[in-house]
Amino acid sequence: MSKSENLYSAARELIPGGVNSPVRAFTGVGGTPLFIEKADGAYLYDVDGKAYIDYVGSWGPMVLGHNHPAIRNAVIEAAERGLSFGAPTEMEVKMAELVTNLVPTMDMVRMVNSGTEATMSAIRLARGFTGRDKIIKFEGCYHGHADCLLVKAGSGALTLGQPNSPGVPADFAKHTLTCTYNDLTSVHAAFEQYPQEIACIIVEPVAGNMNCVPPLPEFLPGLRALCDEFGALLIIDEVMTGFRVALAGAQDYYGVVPDLTCLGKIIGGGMPVGAFGGRRDVMDALAPTGPVYQAGTLSGNPIAMAAGFACLNEVAQPGIHETLDELTTRLAEGLLEAAEDANIPLVVNHVGGMFGIFFTDAESVTCYQDVMACDVERFKRFFHLMLEEGVYLAPSAFEAGFMSVAHSEEDINNTIDAARRVFAKL
């Protein structure tokens, strides 16, 4: 047995499923998950000593590559002054100033510890601010594991075939209205049915939890218009897209102005950080200035703030996002060319530093139904053959891939060459 197999066997006796987040268990592709020893740049190294070109990037945060010296040094320096104080620090102020400068729609920001905390808190705030209970989310979109959001969710929920999680009371779920991503008609119908009851829409500007599905041109502006018409708030969940699709996020890339924004992943540089923020009048409704309660023992802790501050300063450097886009486009075009040469039907969606691989005869993939029609069994074979080639993709047909600026042209070319060999076996 390999070291990964031995560790997985031991882990399953101690941890549910052997992992601390379900998709890591390779449930969506089968086999034994890799146990990682270390990572550097664009590469992961497993406990058996094998190196992999990594397109998971810790599920998004590692936009600069693994073990970036600026982030590592910031964490070490902060740790020498103490790990957590439970009191305000200067770095929290500097971090808030940086975030609100980079994302102009955020007048104010509140730091939390995860993307789930960010979305959960933003929805509570929207409900408190509007005095309404119902929310709109989209089929196949994932916004963390809060009860009200585990309704027809994407990400690991799709991987496990459980779009509705047991343990969520029907009385909670009844306030969550699920519409079809990229379909404004379904959203308008929900507002027509509940014109005075919907507090907010929460949406991934690029759906990254049913693989990678960008918005159609009219979709996000249409959501903004419907929120304005019916007095609801628009929450854009940029946990995945923030600082990746563009410096100011997908909202800037697509030209839509939300009322609230949720952030995660890159904002922590690899440490557990989330944030939500937006209009000043809405944010003022948060405790202690307002009646909507939200708190966290480790929110804004000095280690996480130091990591995030260092990461965002690096991400804000000129040329970062142009490089991400160029590398991702090169990979997408190379995969499509290799698949065509092998007569493999393939769609590759990509935007900024995100991409999605779909085995499908369809010309495009734009919604949940398109995603579910793709050939998952072929993806499973593709995943394992690429893994044998030393390329680590997300172990699920329903998860996006992530590029970093640490990936080189050689890495991209080697990945495309590996895909050519794999397509010949499919």
Swiss-Prot record:
Cofactor: pyridoxal 5'-phosphate
Keywords on record: Cytoplasm, Isomerase, Porphyrin biosynthesis, Pyridoxal phosphate
Isomerase keyword on record: yes
Broad EC category: isomerase
Annotated GO MF terms: glutamate-1-semialdehyde 2,1-aminomutase activity; pyridoxal phosphate binding; transaminase activity
GO BP terms: protoporphyrinogen IX biosynthetic process
Major localisation: cytoplasm
Catalytic reactions of this protein: (S)-4-amino-5-oxopentanoate = 5-aminolevulinate
SUPFAM superfamilies the record matches: PLP-dependent transferases (SSF53383)
Alphabetical list of InterPro entries matching this protein: 4pyrrol_synth_GluAld_NH2Trfase, Aminotrans_3, Aminotrans_3_PPA_site, PyrdxlP-dep_Trfase, PyrdxlP-dep_Trfase_major, PyrdxlP-dep_Trfase_small
Pathway: Porphyrin-containing compound metabolism; protoporphyrin-IX biosynthesis; 5-aminolevulinate from L-glutamyl-tRNA(Glu): step 2/2
EC number, as in UniProt: 5.4.3.8
Subcellular location: Cytoplasm
Xref: Pfam families: Aminotran_3
Modification sites for N6-(pyridoxal phosphate)lysine: 265
One GO cellular component, as annotated: cytoplasm
Family classification: Belongs to the class-III pyridoxal-phosphate-dependent aminotransferase family. HemL subfamily.
Subunit structure: Homodimer.
Name recorded for this polypeptide: Glutamate-1-semialdehyde 2,1-aminomutase
Source organism of the structure: Salmonella gallinarum (strain 287/91 / NCTC 13346)
